[in-house]
Structures are given as C-alpha cells and as structure tokens.
C-alpha cells in the first residue's frame, strides 16, 4: 500500500512538471545581471509581470526602504521600490514574451521590453527605447 501511494504521488508530481505550459516557464524569481535585485515574474490572466522582491542594499541596511524618487510622476516618488511591478503586460507568442513595458526606478524611465528564455535556463531581457536597445541576462533563483 505504501508503495502504491508513493508511486501515485511520484506520477502526479511528474505529470505536473510535464504539464507546465511553455508560456509559464519564466514564472519564478530571477536575479538581475548586476545582482542588485531579485524580480519575481508571475502571471495574471494572459499576461506576465515582474515585481521587485529583494534589493541588495537592504541586506546591509534593513531599515533602508528605497523609494521611486526618480519617477517622472511626482505623485509616485514616495512609493517603495520593494514590491513594485517593474515589468508589465508581457504576452507570450512563439517562444518569446513581448509587447511589455519595463521600468527602471534608478533612471525613472519606462521602455519597451521583450523576454526570451535561453537554452541554458537564463532569461534574456531586451529593452528598447527611442531606437536604442540594451540586453541583459538574468539568472533563475
């Protein structure tokens, strides 16, 4: 009986792993390229967003709560960066996530964003603004 229960639990676990949609493979926590922030990517309905869940500066100073002081909207400058959505509106199509926006709190800048899951499991972030493109590689945590 114990073996049967163990077998059923194992099969259920393996089924869940295989059942994960390709579009959901980016869901999880990612460390940004300069290792200063962890971003949790999550799904709401059919779009993906990413919020800041860890800021390296807070390790040495737990009382520090960085604010969005460079936001172009003065009414948002007092909001905390921790917990803030910095990636919004990502839509999955043909192995990539596109049509989203990324916000850089340190610069107070919004830009177009695309995401691509690389074969090594890293996440390629492609940011475009005014004809310029920058790429970052994030690592899953």
PLM features per residue range, with description:
Residues 20-24, 69-73, 94-97:
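Short Pro/Gly-enriched beta-strand edge/turn motifs at strand-loop
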Residues 1-22:
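Bacterial Sec-dependent N-terminal signal peptides
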Residues 43-47, 93-96, 116-123:
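Short, solvent-exposed coil/turn segments at beta-strand boundaries
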Residues 105-107, 112-116, 122-134:
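Short, exposed beta-strand-loop hairpins at the edges of beta-sheets
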Residues 79-113:
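Mid-chain, well-packed structural core segment of small domains
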Residues 32-49, 53-70, 75, 79-92:
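Short, solvent-exposed loop/hinge segments that bridge or flank secondary-structure elements
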Residues 18-29, 133:
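N-terminal helix-cap/turn-to-beta initiation motif at the start of protein domains
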